[in-house]
Amino acid sequence: MQQLQNVIETAFERRADITPANVDTVTREAVKQVISLLDSGALRVAEKIDGQWVTHQWLKKAVLLSFRINDNQVIDGAESRYFDKVPMKFADYDEARFQKEGFRVVPPAAVRQGAFIARNTVLMPSYVNIGAYVDEGTMVDTWATVGSCAQIGKNVHLSGGVGIGGVLEPLQANPTIIEDNCFIGARSEVVEGVIVEEGSVISMGVYLGQSTKIYDRETGEVHYGRVPAGSVVVSGNLPSKDGKYSLYCAVIVKKVDAKTRGKVGINELLRTID
């Protein structure tokens, strides 16, 4: 694996000079191998090690290199044709392979090659970009988007129209991460490498980026780039120092543990916020 990483790192340093016409065989095969490993879930761009999320930057670099070495090509779809550098993940799947891998894909959901989809996942008409990892039992609801290299945990619900940001455009240092057992409400956006920790509930229409203040009303603490585990979060505003205006923020209205969350439905958690 170290040899593979070295090839990617070296090629990335000279990426501006690489084209589909001049890329060498070693680099092409290395990138192809990484994309295949990401696609199968054998590798992932980020993983939790000893309680901390670690981003494997070289894998992200391989994803970026794939755009340098591949030409656009015609891609067949059910109702249309496409023209892109990245093939679709399910282009060669037959019924037996879908049965074996054990997830559902509702048309016209689109998943790019290099994204991993785990068992018991349901993809409604949605979009999952290259390098993303979607773990077991997760629902990606209608018109939700999972950005490049985003990491989605087990038993997550991404509601209709949710946007999970990617790392490729604009280029971000770390992927956006939604940990296990989280609920992300409809039309919410989580971007710029924000981490939503395990068991959190994000209400409808909440926008979270690195500069978003995440205000805990119980403690008065303000978080940036991280929603603490077990948080119930809604949209809000905080006043300016001079009191003349207010700016958008996200508000942690309560904390819940797994036991409470198991007994109380998501809707009830969001309704009783006073």
Swiss-Prot record:
Keyword tRNA-binding: no
Subcellular location: Cytoplasm
Pathway participation: Amino-acid biosynthesis; L-lysine biosynthesis via DAP pathway; LL-2,6-diaminopimelate from (S)-tetrahydrodipicolinate (succinylase route): step 1/3
Reaction catalysis annotation: (S)-2,3,4,5-tetrahydrodipicolinate + succinyl-CoA + H2O = (S)-2-succinylamino-6-oxoheptanedioate + CoA
Keywords: Acyltransferase, Amino-acid biosynthesis, Cytoplasm, Diaminopimelate biosynthesis, Lysine biosynthesis, Repeat, Transferase
A GO MF term: nucleotidyltransferase activity
Top-level division of the source organism's lineage: Bacteria
Protein residues bound to substrate: 104, 141
One GO-annotated biological process of the protein: lysine biosynthetic process via diaminopimelate
Family classification: Belongs to the transferase hexapeptide repeat family.
Protein name: 2,3,4,5-tetrahydropyridine-2,6-dicarboxylate N-succinyltransferase
